[in-house]
Amino acid sequence: VGKLQVTGWGNTRRITIIINDMKKTKIVATISDKRCEVEFLEKLYRAGMNVVRLNTAHQDMEQALKVVENVRKVSDNIAILIDTKGPEVRTMLMDEPMHVDRGETIYLTGDPELKMEGKLIHVSYPYFAEDIKVGDKVLVDDGDVELVVVEKKDHYLEMMVTNEAVIKNRKSVNVPGASLKLKSLSDKDRAFIDFAIDNNLDFIAHSFVRNKEDVMAIQAILDARGSKIKVIAKIENQEGVDNIDEILDYAYGVMVARGDLGIEIEAEKIPKIQRYIVKKCIESKKPVIIATQMLHTMIEHPRPTRAEISDIANAVYMGTDAIMLSGETAYGAYPEEAVTVMREVAEENEGTVPPDAGRSLVRINNEITAALARSAVKTALMLPIKAIVVDTLSGRTARYLSAFRSDLPVYARCYNERVMRELALSFGVYPYYTEKPMSRDEFMNDLPEMLMQNGIKADDYVVVVGGSFGHGKGASFIEVCKIGEIR
């Protein structure tokens, strides 16, 4: 990720990233308050981490704040993403674990007052018996226990156990294919959204997004407080997959959360769903993250399996913007090595993706910025171009260039540190920050120094995408320049 150089002139502060890590695929790393020392975070940053993820299922606000403060001591360039828990159902009111045998009959209810003979399990959703049908499968504890609905009663379900297991308190309950009337946001979620706003975080990844309304529920809170935090929709069930188009209309980006997705949907369908969602995100010019168990072996072992290496490479081949580590960096024994493996696999395999991969998917939708972005990428293919450079106020032009998946680096000059961090989730974009918005001449005259710091020579050519250099104008021109001749 290179060294951070801070320079300035007059009252203007400029941050220039000198990039040693030239992977285009971004890396998200989950960080726990149990291990978030500044030195540790610096190692992950140097290894290739672009975004820090906080998992609110395992942290309170004091613990999360500790991570945030330490990340900010490392670099303003690292984005911070916080997960909500989202709508979920869990077992509850169990004083002790319950052993169940294959073929045994047990009972499930959402009524906390219900008592009866036999093995009864309470769950945290009051309409459970109402929403579930005879024949539905109910999966407990991340799928370790499978139950089948045999008969429906007014306030409980009669279930048959299909495998011997032990059911414990506060374990997850999933019903593949069922549409439950769960609230999108819990009280804890709302509190953490306020925490994210108060601490100027960059992304909120909302769990179990089923439709546009789930995204809008968070956006309404953000809008009411004037927050610019971007919403990432975590797709974790069939309903989310089915409604991906409307979700993409309202979310900033998408995370393919394969853990719960693989419980809610048959595991053998996950690869094609992953490919489908990545394709949809590229079409919509929205960032996409592939997550869960990418280097699971490295939680305990220093080297990954060949299958894990292939999993990362396949995500790169599909054209994902980012890949994510969970337990590997949160509590695993080899966190720095895991980030390094991800970076090395991404770097090695990005160059083997066909030059036009995904490029034809992107929808222009009569947008001038999108048309210019496509023209810039096509121009770079036809000429001996070394880089694409963009001046961006909102980050939109840089994101659109990213969507066309150029095999050249896209250097994005940003005038807002939040925009710079938002681009930490965009494939192939290397954002850098300048406090003072520039005129066109200032922008062009400043390019040679930055580009040559990043290995581009005076006789190299670049494509410049720019606009009217004013708020709300957007990109309006592309220009091919020889670095040594810019005046």
Q: Where in this protein do the model-derived segments appear?
A:
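Non-catalytic helical/linker scaffolds that mediate oligomerization, partner binding
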Residues: 19-487
